[in-house]
C-alpha cells in the first residue's frame, strides 16, 4: 500500500472531525466532497463519462473501504437484479428455487476476494481457466455460460480483473463484455491495482471495453499515494445497487432523500456508517496534482523495468511472466 504526507494529514483531520457520513443530512460536506472527488478521479483516470455523478444518466462513484467490499457490493447487487428479473419471466418458480440456480464467473487468476464474495453471497463462483498468458477471454466465458444455461442454472455476474495478483495480467474486457451483453450478465471489473495506470496515455489500452461494463473498482491506496483504506467504485446505474440495498428505517429518513445530486451513500455499501475518506483524497490531489500522481505511477513502471533487466541478467532467476506496470 502507499501513503503520503498530504494523505496522512487528511486522515488526521477526518478522524478529528468524527463524521459518520451515512447520509447527506449527517454531514453535507462529507457526501458532497465525495461526489466531487469521485468525478475528479473519473476525469483523471478517464473511464467512460457515464460513471460520473455529473453525467445525465444514473451512474456515479463511491468510496468503499477495500476492493473486497466493492466486489461484494457488485456481486450482491447483480444477484438481486437477476433474481427479480428471472422471477418476473418465470413466475412459476419460488424465490428459493431461483436463488438455488444462480452462478457467477471469474478467472482462476483472480483475487481471493472474488471467491469470498461468492461465499458471502451464497452463490457459487466458477473460476474459469485463463490462457497460457494468464488472461480470461470471452470464448472461455461463453462456453461456461452455455453449459450452465443448458443445465438450468442462471448466470448472474462475471468479475474480470485488470492487474491480477500473481502476474498483473489483464483480462480481455472487450470480448468478455460482448458475451455478458448477449446473456444479460453483469460485468464487474476489478482494477484494484492496474486502475492507477488508466491515467497514463501510454496505458490507454487498459481502458478498452470499459464503456460496456456495469461496475468498476480501483484502490487508491495502491498507486495514488492515499493511505489505506480507500477503494473507488463506479457504477453505470447506481439505482440497481440502491434498489438492492435500500433498508430505510424512519430514523434514517430526511426530507432531501431521492434528490439526484445528494446521494445517501449508505445505500451504496455494506455498512451503515462511513468515514470521511474523501477528505484525504481531496488534500492529496490538491497538494500533489494530477501530473505529480501520473509521474509517481510512471516511476513505478520504470523501476519495474529496471529490476526486470537485472533479473534477466542473473541465471539464478527465471521470470514467470513479463513485467507489467510495477510487478516483476
UniProtKB/Swiss-Prot annotation:
Query: Where on the chain is N6-(pyridoxal phosphate)lysine found, per UniProt?
Result: 222
- Function summary: Involved in cuticle development. Probably responsible for the protein cross-linking during the development of flexible cuticles.
Quote the PANTHER family the UniProt record gives. 3,4-DIHYDROXYPHENYLACETALDEHYDE SYNTHASE, GROUP II PYRIDOXAL-5-PHOSPHATE DECARBOXYLASE
Lyase keyword on record:
yes
**GO cellular component terms, semicolon-separated:** cytoplasm
* Family annotation (PROSITE patterns): DDC_GAD_HDC_YDC (PS00392)
> What's a Pfam family in this record?
Pyridoxal_deC
The record, for InterPro entries, names:
Aromatic_deC, PyrdxlP-dep_de-COase, PyrdxlP-dep_Trfase, PyrdxlP-dep_Trfase_major, PyrdxlP-dep_Trfase_small, Pyridoxal-P_BS
Keywords per UniProt:
Catecholamine metabolism, Cuticle, Lyase, Pyridoxal phosphate
Q: Which reaction does it catalyse?
A: L-dopa + O2 + H2O + H(+) = 3,4-dihydroxyphenylacetaldehyde + H2O2 + NH4(+) + CO2
The active site lies at 111
Q: Name one GO biological process term.
A: carboxylic acid metabolic process
**SUPFAM superfamilies, alphabetized:** PLP-dependent transferases
| Cofactor names | pyridoxal 5'-phosphate
One Gene Ontology MF term: aromatic-L-amino-acid decarboxylase activity
Member of which family? Answer: Belongs to the group II decarboxylase family.
The enzyme's E.C. designation: 4.1.1.107
The protein's name in its UniProt record? 3,4-dihydroxyphenylacetaldehyde synthase 2
Amino acid at each position: 500500500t502507499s501513503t503520503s504526507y498530504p494523505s496522512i494529514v487528511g486522515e488526521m483531520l477526518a478522524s478529528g472531525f468524527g463524521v459518520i457520513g451515512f447520509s447527506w443530512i449527517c454531514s453535507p460536506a462529507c457526501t458532497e466532497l465525495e461526489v466531487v472527488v469521485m468525478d475528479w478521479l473519473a476525469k483523471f483516470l478517464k473511464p467512460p463519462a457515464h460513471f460520473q455523478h455529473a453525467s445525465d444518466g444514473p451512474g456515479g462513484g463511491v468510496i468503499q473501504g477495500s476492493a473486497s467490499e466493492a466486489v461484494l457490493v457488485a456481486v450482491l447487487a447483480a444477484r438481486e437484479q437477476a433474481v427479480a428479473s428471472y422471477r418476473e419471466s418465470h413466475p412459476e418458480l419460488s424465490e428459493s428455487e431461483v436463488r438455488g440456480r444462480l452462478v457467477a464467473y471469474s478467472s482462476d487468476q483472480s483475487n481471493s476476494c472474488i471467491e469470498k464474495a461468492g461465499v458471502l453471497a451464497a452463490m457459487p463462483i466458477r473460476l474459469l481457466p485463463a490462457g497460457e498468458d494468464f488472461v480470461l477471454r470471452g470464448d472461455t466465458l461463453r462456453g461456461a455460460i452455455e453449459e450452465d444455461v443448458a443445465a438450468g442454472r442462471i448466470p448472474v455476474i462475471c468479475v474480470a480483473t485488470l492487474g491480477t495478483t500473481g502476474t498483473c495480467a489483464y483480462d480481455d474486457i472487450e470480448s468478455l463484455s460482448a458475451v455478458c451483453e448477449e446473456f444479460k450478465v453483469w460485468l464487474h471489473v476489478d482494477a484494484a491495482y492496474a486502475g492507477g495506470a488508466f491515467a497514463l496515455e501510454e496505458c490507454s489500452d487498459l481502458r478498452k471495453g470499459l464503456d460496456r461494463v456495469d461496475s468498476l473498482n480501483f484502490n487508491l491506496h495502491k498507486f495514488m499515494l492515499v493511505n489505506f483504506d480507500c477503494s473507488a467504485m463506479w457504477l453505470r446505474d447506481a439505482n440497481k445497487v440502491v434498489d438492492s440495498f435500500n433498508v430505510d428505517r424512519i430514523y434514517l429518513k430526511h426530507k432531501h432523500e431521492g434528490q439526484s445530486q445528494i446521494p445517501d451513500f449508505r445505500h451504496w455499501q455494506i455498512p451503515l456508517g462511513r468515514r470521511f475518506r474523501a477528505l484525504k483524497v481531496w488534500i492529496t490531489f490538491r497538494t500533489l496534482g494530477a501530473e505529480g500522481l501520473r509521474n509517481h505511477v510512471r516511476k513505478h513502471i520504470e523501476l519495474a523495468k529496471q529490476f526486470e533487466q537485472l533479473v534477466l541478467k542473473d541465471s539464478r532467476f527465471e521470470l514467470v511472466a513479463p513485467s507489467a506496470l510495477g510487478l516483476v
